[in-house]
Amino acid sequence: MKKIVTIGLATTMLLALSGAPAQAHDRLEPTRLTIKVSDKSVDKGDKVTFQGKLKSDWKKCRANSKVKLVRKQKVVATKMTSPNGSYKFRKKVKSTATYRVKFSGKKVNVVHPHNHRCLSSQSKSVKVRAT
């Protein structure tokens, strides 16, 4: 009798610890970027501040994400967002140019067979005139 109870207990423990197999799923979370500039018309050589937020319903997409300030399709600066998705760039403007901020997307909690991704986004363009 003692042997049967021991075998039953061992079987129950084995089943409880093994758990159900993981189910594969995708989570593709959209993002969007805002941008504001401190001054749209400056003297050549003046500094301006570009700031905004990376927005998403999923906090993991907003927090600690790499965003890039782009001018003439070239990356001029890179920053990590704050826990709430905020970013700020301070740049010297030497000539009139159009700027935008880009987020390339990222993978989150990459554990096979799950696919969790924050989708890429970019802000609207802002033109800063330097005279």
Model-predicted segments: where are they?
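Beta-strand-rich domain onsets/edges
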Residues: 23-49, 53-55
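Local beta-strand/beta-hairpin segments that build beta-sheet-rich folds
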Residues: 76-78
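Glycine-centered loop-to-beta-strand initiation motif
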Residues: 80-91
